[in-house]
A protein has these predicted regions:
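Hydrophobic faces of well-ordered beta-strands that scaffold small-molecule active sites
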Residues: 22-24, 86-88, 133-135, 166-170, ...
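Polysaccharide-binding and catalytic clefts of secreted carbohydrate-active enzymes
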Residues: 1-129, 138
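Solvent-exposed loop/turn segments at secondary-structure junctions
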Residues: 28-30, 92-95, 138-142, 172-175, ...
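Alpha-helical structural signal in soluble globular domains
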Residues: 16, 72-80, 123, 127, ...
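Core-facing hydrophobic residues within beta-strands of well-ordered domains
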Residues: 19, 130, 194, 238-241
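Alpha-helical scaffolding within the catalytic cores
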Residues: 108-125, 144-159, 180-185
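C-terminal structured "cap/appendage" subdomains that terminate the fold
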Residues: 172-195
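Pro/Thr/Ser/Gly-rich low-complexity, intrinsically disordered linker/stalk tracts
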Residues: 211-246
Length: 246
């Protein structure tokens, strides 16, 4: 019922308004709080155990609940306006290396999308259920638990596919406090799969926190540019632009 309601809301927004995209942030299952387990025993009994899941498979069941939501939202958009994009801005760590039997996780030590929020972002990218992915890499270069460079390298290598754009979510206040804007911008531009940045929160740019807006305008965004093309959403080139004046 919850998925159906959310999809009805998405369908209403997409059909009534000329929007570019439906965007979701990092809220799937709640962020865990010590001593406060998520109260879904009755739901798991009805929709999990009664459907063939084992007691030990509650995590898999939760992940599949979220997978179904993402898949159904994408399908809802495709049936309404297939050119409208669907994107996610997940928490910045997919899985820590120590949590993955094959060592495929990042060399980090923090909360995890897959294990703690039950958000299998890498699968959504692989399956083409989202059109863009903006992991929130809000830490500094050299952070002991979640190093910025380690994480953007991981996302650039492990969670990309043709047709799903990768952008880096930047924390403006923390970046400027650490005086790392230049290093971050130059490094992410060296990665082949990264299409750009999204800066959070926007008011830090408007307030020009520690000169961030000036630096972006003068050094990194000096010239107008088109956003990267989402060619997988359509197979026709737009018509030639006419009546332009130099």
């Amino acid at each position: 019922e919850s998925r159906q309601f959310i999809c009805r809301v998405v369908r209403d927004i997409v059909s009534r308004y000329d929007i570019d995209a439906i965007h979701m942030d990092d809220y799937f299952y709640p962020y865990p709080v010590a001593g406060m387990p998520f109260p879904d025993d009755k739901s798991f009994q009805k929709y999990g155990l009664n459907k063939g899941y084992k007691v030990s498979q509650r995590a898999e069941w939760r992940r599949e609940n979220v997978n179904k939501l993402i898949r159904e939202i994408k399908r809802t958009i495709l049936l309404s306006k297939p050119w409208v994009r669907f994107g996610i801005s997940p928490f910045g760590i997919y899985r820590n290396k120590k949590s993955t039997p094959d060592g495929s996780g990042s060399n980090t030590n923090g909360l995890q999308n897959y294990d703690d929020l039950y958000a299998d972002v890498a699968r959504w990218v692989k399956e083409g259920w989202i059109d863009y992915n903006i992991p929130q890499i809000y830490w500094e270069i050299g952070h002991p638990a979640a190093d910025y460079i380690t994480l953007i390298q991981w996302w650039n290598k492990n969670a990309t596919r043709e047709g799903t754009h990768l952008y880096i979510g930047q924390n403006v206040a923390r970046t400027m406090k650490a005086d790392q804007l230049t290093r971050k911008m130059l490094y992410e531009r060296s990665l082949s799969k990264v299409k750009g940045n999204c800066f959070w929160p926007a008011n830090e740019i408007l307030w020009n926190n520690k000169g961030v807006a000036d630096s972006l305008k003068q050094n990194y965004h000096r010239y107008p540019a088109l956003i990267p093309a989402y060619t997988h959403l359509h197979n026709r080139a737009p018509q030639e632009v006419k009546k332009l004046k130099a």
